[in-house]
Amino acid sequence: MDTNIINHYDIIIIGGGIAGLSATRHLLLKMPELSGRIAVIEPRSERRDNLDEDYKVGESTVEVSAMFFAKELELQDYLIENHPPKFSLQFHWPRELSKTDTIEDYYSTWAVKNPDIQAFQLNRCKIERDLLKMVIAQGAVYYHGRVRNVDNLDNDDMKSIDVEILSEVESGADFKLQQSIERITLTTDYIVDASGRNFTVGSRTDNILKDPKHLFGLDNASTWVRVKNTERSLFDFKSQDVTCSWTYDTNHFFGPGYWIWMIPLERGSRDYSIGVSYHRDKIQPSQLNSLDKFMSFLEKNQKLLYNLIKSGEIVDFHRWPKLAHTSKTFFSKNNWCVIGDAAAIFDPFYSTGMVMIAMEIECLTEMLKFKLSNAANDYHRRVEAFDKLIRCVTQINNHLIKDHSNHLGNASIMSWRIYFESSTYFSILLPAYIGKYHLCPIFSDHFTTDHENGLALRNQLLATLDYANENSINIGFMDNHRGGQLLGDWSPTSSWDYDHALSLAKYGHKRLNLPKCLSWSNFYLSLIICKLYYRVYGIGALWNSSFFKSLSNTTYRFSKFYFLSKLHSFNMIGTPNNDYYDKIQKDFKSYNYNQNNIVDWKY
């Protein structure tokens, strides 16, 4: 076997899945001069024609991740042409656990309108194959091989990577038939670990945290199938009360200690990813470790989904008996980082996986701009700031799953939880992303300083829901899509754009008035707290110390951010909302239309 064929690259990305390929494309789009200077190492072949190699959980994007793919990766038209649209997240609880034959047997929150920002359902096999072709065309160097060793991860010296190059196999042949051809050594100044659960860097640096004590008690697992050509009429719920599809959404079906996703993978053909995320204190992995057991579970607990799968053809079956993990370090001072599943995964609920990837990749690119231009101080400033920021963002996404085991199956408790958690996402995270605040080290410092305070407030709200759940208190059913439940027509998913960022096209860095969004987010969260505590404790809420602590927290934050919003508005005087449209208006002043001066042509 040949060994030691050495090549050097500025950046090596370990892993050619959606995280690694998205990072590669983003880096090459923002810094085209990196063509030929980025390598991708992946054990799957460049051909990618074997489904057994490419099984994935169907990935549902939300507004943040959709904007990342459409704008940052410049894939808007590609997504429209190749992947199903996504209109919303929809949630369904059985009216009676023993009767789940049709959708009318559920209490549901349905999307009521088309989304403000178009999201997509991603067929992971398809998009990874297409992204691979794109990045190779952009100048990335692809190595079909497996990483065997990495040196110098504990210092900032140049890294050395031992790679086992693999053979191609016949089209459609078993992935495991690949043979080792040779061993080569690659060197690089920076490593991006996107190797997923192989944890190429994490396993060599003691960076992975899997114990539930590091995950807010989260101990979950997952089982799923892909199915094609299902019967359309089984989930063809029609209504004259809305203006959008109820099929091209991520539908969530709930039960005690578990929830099930239903994600369309193709347009028109009714192909789905259908899987369960469950908590191991309620269901053991041994109870769902085969297709027969999974189907038996659905037949007794979610008959509608059982019938849907039985009507089609099962493509594959997969399971993860241990789902959640996180990392100690995300961006290291030793010139490596972890992204995607190699960094953290908690639960597919709320479709947060690609949101984390989007922020990780944008921070990575921003950081490496300074490293590659030899601006050492600016680079190290961002390594520290972005590592703290991403750690806080992942902790928030982890905390979103805290106590799910006890809440998921209760339609009253969980609908309330979805209601206020949707408010936080739409009023805080989405505007911050639109305004690109996450790329500012100063914002990162402020965000991370306030992080523990935010988690403490959430803990108080979860404790209130725990009390209602343990005492079987019906606190009503909240629909996160509709207005008219809190104050006027306000709703978490439709009333978030307090600064009119979409209509004014405030997409530039910090053009959007984020303090204004934070201010009004806390105002409505204060109202949510008042209504929630009254539903749980009645008039006794006035004697509840937790109520006053929570309300004083949000009231103070409302006042604080209201003042900062006025300061932001003052500082933006004279700055256009959008440079592109401002330039059009200025250029148009010289426009002069002459209807008699048609340009001649040959005829």
Curated annotation (Swiss-Prot):
Family per similarity comment: Belongs to the flavin-dependent halogenase family.
Observed effect of gene inactivation: Impairs the production of DIF-1 and leads to deficiencies in slug structure and fruiting body formation.
Protein name as it appears in the record: Flavin-dependent halogenase chlA
Enzyme class: oxidoreductase
Gene name per UniProt: ChlA
SUPFAM superfamilies: FAD/NAD(P)-binding domain
Known role: Flavin-dependent halogenase; part of the gene cluster that mediates the biosynthesis of DIF-1 (Differentiation Inducing Factor-1), a signal molecule involved in the differentiation of pstO (prestalk-O) cells. The three-step process begins with the formation of (2,4,6-trihydroxyphenyl)-1-hexan-1-one (THPH) by the polyketide synthase StlB. THPH is then dichlorinated by the flavin-dependent halogenase ChlA. The last step of DIF-1 biosynthesis is the O-methylation of dichloro-THPH (or des-methyl-DIF-1) by the methyltransferase DmtA to yield DIF-1.
EC nos: 1.14.14.-
Gene3D superfamilies noted in UniProt: FAD/NAD(P)-binding domain
Binding site for FAD: 16, 19, 59
Catalytic activity reported: 2,4,6-trihydroxyphenylhexan-1-one + FADH2 + chloride + O2 = (3-chloro-2,4,6-trihydroxyphenyl)hexan-1-one + FAD + 2 H2O + H(+); (3-chloro-2,4,6-trihydroxyphenyl)hexan-1-one + FADH2 + chloride + O2 = (3,5-dichloro-2,4,6-trihydroxyphenyl)hexan-1-one + FAD + 2 H2O
One GO biological process term: slug development involved in sorocarp development
MF-aspect GO terms: flavin-dependent halogenase activity; monooxygenase activity
Coiled coil: none
Alphabetic keyword roster: FAD, Flavoprotein, Monooxygenase, Oxidoreductase
Binding positions (chloride): 352-353
Claim: Oxidoreductase is one of the keywords in the record: yes
